[in-house]
Amino acid sequence: MAGLQLDFEWRITLATALLLPALIALGFWQLERAEEKAGLEARWSARQSEAPAPLSALASSDPQQLAYRRVSLQGRFLPGHYLLLDNRMHQGRFGNEVIGLLALDDSDQVVLVNRGWVPSDPARLVLPEVPAPEGAVTLTGHIYVSPGKPYLLGEQQLAPPWPVRIQAVDTEALAPLVATVTDAVLYPHPVRIDSGQPGALTVAWQLVNASPQKHQGYALQWFTMAAVLAFFFLLRSSNLWQLLTRKRHEA
């Protein structure tokens, strides 16, 4: 009885040779993403046990060392000057995150303090009015370090009047705008406020947009697709199906 015989059709072989490595690569990429997210969650958990420290007490300028560090800030919000981070959803409702400009008392720096979420007009015709606390405030929060350059749907119009709606928090791009209202130096990373602090709104920070388990699930999907493709390629390029059906009939 003849054994397994192979007969490769070049079009199918070429398509499989292109698709199969891509599917496998996507699976491993998702596993890498899962590992990154797990690392972020572990770093976040470790930071939560630390006591808040003044920004001036943080010796490192390495963004990875600063990420999620708990800080305490003393200063004054610049009245009437705040940013609205657009298209933020909370429990299915459209809104903005409100980012105030806090001039620090102990340095010549100003910090972007993300005060949390507020509902807003889905048509974007009316901007929410969200006054900041007046006078000196002391608050706590954590430093947020962006994982990379934000993706923008179009060029941001970073100019008065205030409040200014933005697509993403890019301190380098926002520095000229902040310089129109203060001579203080803009701190390179925003601070996300803790719940219950002066000026805090609806605070429900999302650590990652997809959990490590979700990325692992995506990886399994890609690997499954690769396995299915390889199996059907083998069926199409050999007499495997005939051998399987023959054995079943003989049984």
Residue map of PLM features:
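Phosphate-centric recognition/catalysis
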Residues: 62
